[in-house]
Amino acid sequence: MDTFDIQAYVRRSRALDLRGIEWDAVPRHRLPDEAVRTLRYMQDIESHTIIYLRTLLSTRAVDDPDVAAFLACWVYEETHHGRALAQFLHAAGHETFDRPARSRVPLGEALRARLTSVVARAWPDFVAVHMTWGAINELTTYLGYQRLAQLAGHPVLAEILARIMRDEMRHFSFYYHEAEKRLVRPTTARIARALVDRFWAPVGSAEQPLEETRFLATYLFSGPAGRAAARRVDEKIRRLPGFAGVALVEAWIDGMPRDEPAPRQVAYHPIGAPALARARVAR
């Protein structure tokens, strides 16, 4: 089992380094419309990472000092990813659309968050689910950025994404190490696997319109190279205890509705806390 040096990570954590980025060169290179649409989706999600912490912060996850330290750095870094993507879009002459963070949570969502908190505190190993969920989403995000850089063919964007990806890989390493460590108990692994099988959907799919999620999946993960990226996620997660044979990203893409929106069902919160989301587009 690999180790993760949380102290080294905390010491290195900082806002995304954008020194040397040639912002003046951004408009000199063509940026495909598909890349603009994808960037807006990603920028919105990165900028609202703080929202995803609401439920998580009420669980046992933050009782672990390593997890608490990581999350403080994680949300700071992710927020700066969103700012960097917004700055790039503006430099390219494109607007970003602000989605204000809600100060008041709807009653139904608040009740679901409370239920999650109660369940998580009653079952100490629930943190394993959070960590597994985070590993899946961070690796998917990393590979999504890699695909976007390849497809967009914009040299300045490629440099910005490369810097973001270094952060995302560190995030993935932490989540994966923690999941691997916590899933060694067969009962924990079995329950975590059942929850992932039943509820997983990519980050943002509960917040973004279905057509945007569908577009993102098609643009980034179709074709031989896209499918290979999707398989990399599944193959890595299958190495976790209890997750042999799990079908995640490819199964999600194959099961996504092409024409009509999916009915509103139970989904899983992007950070790993169970919640009723707007639409379950997985399967």
Task: Name each model-derived stretch.
Residues 1-283:
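Non-heme di-metal
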